[in-house]
């Protein structure tokens, strides 16, 4: 399962062009594949993942050992690591995707013009997607399943840290495609660790790639957004906030804040800033801060938060705009809803933000005025996930405002075309 760290430039360019050409041909087949055939492939993939769990764990153990030896952070290792539960989650995600309605060919609108022509707006696949991700090997299964269901071919380029894990997972997906009689090039894995492959994908490979989805840290996403010559679905940061309003229940606030920060601190849906209404602070600030610190979270707070618990360290200006991806949270007492919304607008990343309150009017204002892809009322920010939205999985979360926003599932991986039915009409 070893791959060359670097390939000859000419060989790599030829390799990537060949991958893209085959993916393009596979996309033509998938665009016309019946839902039953795609679902057969998804079922076979899920079965292969479950049956191959020992192989997946062995491959992943090598990746994890290598990452630890190179000094990877605990959050990075957590994103990289597989276990039986995570493999089952991957397989179950494929089962959910299989059960989703097929978006391809769905007529979303139909109308008749005064001249008798009937016009239909119909969902169609995007074509070929390139997914560039870093440490999470489960992204490969999620992206492969969603692209297959939506009739798209996909070229996947995982991080070098997860290369062995990705090879093992990809073998399961390829097996499923074979069993369904679908082209293996429908889900391709870049077979080299050479970082130059990323640049070739970003070029669009002479029009063979239709969309790029980066899944990883800020440096990867920033590079993709700066260099890509094709459309990108992405988010740069997950600098997410939880605002505890003056009308919040303390028990609910404690449950939500703890989950939003500490369930998995390294994922993009983790909360990075806690905002507490000044009117709620006397009763709620000390219990919330103490709970987080007792759970192993470092709290960096303003002067009001520091007064609530001697263990709080001073917050810096940079902390407000930081995605920590670790058990660290910035905390601030704000004057009320208006100041909370203003703070989120200034420092947030338009990803996911939540309000905890029993005041329906305050909740409505927050949901309407916070300009993020996902806004929540009385729920944890860690629900920022396609699987939790009922999409089965997600290929990523987009914070842009064109085409796709929020979790990108099968519907967001389609575009549309217009079918016009006439009876001989000509334009006067």
Swiss-Prot record:
Pfam family, one: Aldedh
GO-annotated molecular function: glutamate-5-semialdehyde dehydrogenase activity; NADP binding
PROSITE patterns: PROA
Alphabetized UniProt keyword annotations: Amino-acid biosynthesis, Cytoplasm, NADP, Oxidoreductase, Proline biosynthesis
Pathway: Amino-acid biosynthesis; L-proline biosynthesis; L-glutamate 5-semialdehyde from L-glutamate: step 2/2
Top EC category: oxidoreductase
Listed GO biological process terms: L-proline biosynthetic process
Cell compartment(s), UniProt: Cytoplasm
Transmembrane regions listed in the UniProt entry: none
Catalytic activity: L-glutamate 5-semialdehyde + phosphate + NADP(+) = L-glutamyl 5-phosphate + NADPH + H(+)
InterPro entries recorded: Ald_DH/histidinol_DH, Ald_DH_C, Ald_DH_N, Aldehyde_DH_dom, G-glutamylP_reductase_CS, Glu-5-SA_DH, GPR_dom
Statement: the UniProt record of this protein carries the keyword Cytoplasm: yes
Family the UniProt entry places it in: Belongs to the gamma-glutamyl phosphate reductase family.
HAMAP family xrefs: ProA
Role noted for this protein: Catalyzes the NADPH-dependent reduction of L-glutamate 5-phosphate into L-glutamate 5-semialdehyde and phosphate. The product spontaneously undergoes cyclization to form 1-pyrroline-5-carboxylate.
Name of this chain's protein: Gamma-glutamyl phosphate reductase
Lineage of the organism: Bacteria, Pseudomonadati, Pseudomonadota, Alphaproteobacteria, Hyphomicrobiales
């Amino acid at each position: 399962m070893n791959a060359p760290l670097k390939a000859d430039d000419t060989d790599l360019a030829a390799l990537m062009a060949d991958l893209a050409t085959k993916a393009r041909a596979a996309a033509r087949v998938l665009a016309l594949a019946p839902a039953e055939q795609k679902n057969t492939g998804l079922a076979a993939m899920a079965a292969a993942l479950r049956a191959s769990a020992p192989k997946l764990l062995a491959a992943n153990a090598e990746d994890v050992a290598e990452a630890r030896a190179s000094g990877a952070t605990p959050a990075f290792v957590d994103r990289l690591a597989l276990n039986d539960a995570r493999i089952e989650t991957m397989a179950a995600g494929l089962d959910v995707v299989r059960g989703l309605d097929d978006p391809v060919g769905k007529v979303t609108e139909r109308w008749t013009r005064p001249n008798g022509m009937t016009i239909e707006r119909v969902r169609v696949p995007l074509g070929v997607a390139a997914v560039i991700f870093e440490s999470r090997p489960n992204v490969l299964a999620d992206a492969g399943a969603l692209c297959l269901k939506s009739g798209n071919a996909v070229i996947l380029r995982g991080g070098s840290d997860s290369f062995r894990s990705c090879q093992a997972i990809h073998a399961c997906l390829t097996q499923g495609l074979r069993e369904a009689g679908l082209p293996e090039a429908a889900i391709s894995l870049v077979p080299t660790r050479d970082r130059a492959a990323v640049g070739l994908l970003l070029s669009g490979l002479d029009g063979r790639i239709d969309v790029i989805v980066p899944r990883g840290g800020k440096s990867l996403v920033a590079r993709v957004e700066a260099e890509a010559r094709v459309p990108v679905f992405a988010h740069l940061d997950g600098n997410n906030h939880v605002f505890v309003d003056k009308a919040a229940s303390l028990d609910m606030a404690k449950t939500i804040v703890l989950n939003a920060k500490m369930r998995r601190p390294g994922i993009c849906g983790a909360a990075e800033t806690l905002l507490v209404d000044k009117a709620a602070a006397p009763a709620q600030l000390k219990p919330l801060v103490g709970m987080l610190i007792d759970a192993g979270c470092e709290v960096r707070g303003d002067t009001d938060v520091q007064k609530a618990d001697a263990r709080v360290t001073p917050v810096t200006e940079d902390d407000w705009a930081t995605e920590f991806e670790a058990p660290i949270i910035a905390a601030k007492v704000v004057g009320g809803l208006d100041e909370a919304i203003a703070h989120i607008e200034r420092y947030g990343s338009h990803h996911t933000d939540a309000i905890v309150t029993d005041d329906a009017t305050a909740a409505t204002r927050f949901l309407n005025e916070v300009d993020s892809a996902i806004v929540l009322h009385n729920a944890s920010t860690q629900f920022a996930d396609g699987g939790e939205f009922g999409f089965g999985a997600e290929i990523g979360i987009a914070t842009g405002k064109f085409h796709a926003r929020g979790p990108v599932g099968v519907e967001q991986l389609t575009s549309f075309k217009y079918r016009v039915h006439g009876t001989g009409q000509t334009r006067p």
